[in-house]
Amino acid sequence: QIGGDLPNVYLLQGDFTNEDMNELYNHPKIKAMISFTKGEGFGRPLLEFCLSKKPVIASGWSGQMDFLNPQFAQMIPGQLENVHPSAANKWLLKEFQWFGIETRHAKRILKDVYKKYKKYSIAAKKQGHYIRTNFSREKMGELVGKVLEANIPKFAQQVDLKLPEINANVKLPKIS
């Protein structure tokens, strides 16, 4: 049973344009991003949301760990567990594992962010700066360039040929 003065929670579903997502991320009624992802991807919505400089509460697993700084974002611990049989299909095998959060920890963090929003808002601004500084297109271009340089062999390069001059007075034998 949940009681007390709690905020409204809305579940949104459907296809959203980039403009829709930007408006949603920056809407004044949106106070935080909460994602209990099981590890389905690198976490693009979390990365985008960080630019809004609002608190992020997310699973402490998978791709978002590359860009969410635990000093600034709230990471929910958990453990790998088998995919639920009802979710298994030909792409998601029952032998696979996904991440399950520790719900008690998640509840505690949700309440703390709600009660001490200003504190978490300051950390979120630092997370936004961290993203802009370390994950800009320019920075990613530099990093990808370094990886390519280190892992792709040097290819042959075109060079100018210096052939001897042809002597027009040379008589070539006739072939019959």
Whereabouts are the PLM-identified features?
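Nucleotide-activated donor-binding/catalytic signature segment of Leloir-type glycosyltransferases, i.e.
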Residues: Q1-E19, L24, K31
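Short glycine/proline-enriched, acidic/aromatic patches that form the donor-sugar handling elements
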Residues: M21, G43, S62-F67, E81-A88
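A short alpha->beta transition loop at the rim of the catalytic pocket in nucleotide-sugar-dependent
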Residues: K29-K31, K53, G60
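Aromatic "clamp/platform" in nucleotide-sugar-dependent glycosyltransferases that forms part
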Residues: K38
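A short, glycine- and acidic-residue-rich donor-binding loop in the catalytic cores
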Residues: F42-E48, V56, G63
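Short hydrophobic beta-strand element within catalytic cores of glycosyltransferases
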Residues: P55-A58, Q74-P77
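C-terminal amphipathic helix plus adjacent low-complexity
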Residues: K90-S176
